[in-house]
């Protein structure tokens, strides 16, 4: 926890206390989760949220999702290979080094949704795809096809996906074997980074 707090203070200076409130690190378990959340927000999540929020403000139809379905294990023929950070496969001695360097992924990794959305599972012989994987892929393709055709992903046989900005609370779809809508609880984190990056770009 002390090292985590020190890194946060180095990165954020006078705003570190607010960061530590939004991403607390009182225990090792909390540090692991908060450091993961903070790194993800800095790398990808905040910018994706900002992009979606600006389109929403402009009146565009925006439908946000969180992809939560992890890939299945690799087929036995892959013989100890490991998945790359954002796609691809690492084999043999390089794979052993990768396993040591990286902890096991929790949930779905970045880029894992692509082959599901494109319906390409059968062409990827690395993983032992299951009926549940096919189910998730069909769900995503249904939403994508509807959005391309009509600007609205909803359609017969699909769980209702609320448009961003509908209702009193911000909502998004969680894509998994059992898709469901979740209320956004992290907006304060994104709004903090919005202010932080605007201050960085403002003239002194």
What name fits each language-model region?
Residues 28-31, 121, 176-180, 188:
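A short alpha-helix capping/helix-coil boundary motif
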Residues 1-132, 143, 150:
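Substrate-gating cap/lid region and adjacent catalytic-acid/histidine neighborhood
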Residues 108-109, 138, 165-167:
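A structural signal for short secondary-structure junctions
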Residues 88-95, 100, 177-204:
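Tryptophan-rich aromatic "cage" segments
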């Amino acid at each position: 926890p002390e090292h985590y707090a020190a890194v946060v203070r180095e990165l954020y200076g006078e705003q570190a206390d607010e960061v530590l409130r939004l991403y607390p690190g009182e225990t090792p378990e909390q540090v692991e989760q908060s450091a993961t959340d903070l790194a993800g927000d800095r790398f990808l999540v905040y910018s994706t949220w900002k992009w979606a929020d600006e389109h929403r403000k402009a009146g565009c139809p925006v439908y946000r999702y969180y992809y939560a379905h992890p890939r299945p294990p690799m087929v036995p023929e892959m013989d100890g290979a490991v998945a790359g950070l954002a796609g691809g496969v690492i084999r043999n001695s390089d794979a052993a080094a990768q396993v040591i360097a990286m902890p096991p992924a929790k949930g779905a990794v970045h880029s894992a949704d692509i082959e599901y959305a494109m319906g390409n599972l059968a062409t990827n012989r690395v993983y032992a795809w299951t009926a549940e994987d096919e189910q998730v892929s069909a769900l995503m393709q249904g939403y994508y096809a509807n959005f391309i055709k009509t600007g609205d992903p909803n359609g017969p046989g699909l769980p209702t996906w609320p448009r961003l900005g509908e209702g009193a609370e911000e909502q998004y779809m969680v894509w998994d074997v059992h898709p469901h809508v979740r209320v956004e609880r992290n907006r304060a984190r994104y709004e903090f980074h919005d202010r932080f990056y605007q201050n960085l770009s403002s003239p002194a």
